[in-house]
Regions:
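Short, basic (Lys/Arg/His-rich) helix/loop patches that form interaction surfaces
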Residues: 15-26, 92, 108-117, 122-134, ...
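Ser/Thr-centric signal marking residues that sit
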Residues: 36, 85, 128, 180, ...
Length: 233
């Protein structure tokens, strides 16, 4: 599905991941995606060097691309790519929830060891799989599918037992996290310039479109508010 998650779907999904011992290891990564609106390549490429816990700032300056090599080996590998536009280079302030998972993750890695995998001279990646490699987007999508399917089959059983309608989570891809963040942001913030900056949109019209989608009734409420404040006819 290409739609952002609703507030309820987002809450349900994250609560399920947080409580499920099989899926919990994905929780910090999903919080990061939903709390920063980063593109998937930016998120898998984030390094501890890009994270300033003291000032609570995330520096977005590159992303990782996972692709098949052109030779006969059919091997896949990561490459570092730099933002296509100046807007892609940005600094995102950390939400409290993002700060908390990063802090926790940092403490855990201090005990268990940091990522030593080297991609184009970069290392120290924050989010890695059990082999110490950065996540590849296809694996993230598989994990989301597994989580959603497991949740939905458990929910179906529970709903039958409790004689109610099941509340399902739709299947979605990792890109939807960014879309969902943008929707929540637009629902809570009216300053388009700020939204554009955090999202790293080169063109403000991209931001405007997302804003309009997230707030279909906004025109009506703006006019209503205006009429309340314009008691001057």
């Amino acid at each position: 599905t290409g739609c952002p998650l609703t507030v309820d779907q987002q809450r349900k999904f994250m609560e399920y991941v947080a409580k499920n011992p099989f899926f919990y290891h994905w929780y910090p990564f999903f919080v990061f995606l939903l709390g920063t609106g980063c593109r998937i390549g930016e998120a898998i490429g984030i390094r501890w060097d890009d994270i300033d816990l003291e000032n609570r700032i995330i520096d977005i300056n590159h992303s990782l691309t996972y692709y098949q090599r052109a030779d006969d080996s059919y091997k896949c590998e990561f490459r570092v790519s730099l933002p296509k536009t100046e807007a892609g280079n940005r600094r995102i302030p950390m939400m409290q929830q993002v700060y908390d998972v990063l802090q926790e993750e940092y403490e855990r890695q201090k005990q268990e060891g940091f990522c030593v995998e080297n991609v184009d001279g970069m290392t120290n990646f924050v989010f890695t799989n059990r082999f110490g490699m950065p996540h590849n987007p296809a694996a993230v999508n598989r994990a989301i599918k597994r989580i959603v399917d497991t949740h939905n089959s458990e929910e179906e059983v529970a709903a039958k037992k409790e004689k109610r309608e099941p509340v399902m989570i739709p299947r979605f891809s990792c890109h939807i996290f960014r879309h969902t963040f943008a929707s929540r942001f637009c629902e809570n913030e009216t300053n388009i310039k700020v939204i554009q900056e955090v999202m790293g949109h080169a063109d403000v019209s991209t931001t405007m479109n997302i804003y309009a989608e997230a707030n279909p009734d906004v025109t009506k409420s703006v006019i209503e508010k205006l009429s309340k404040n314009m008691d001057i006819f």
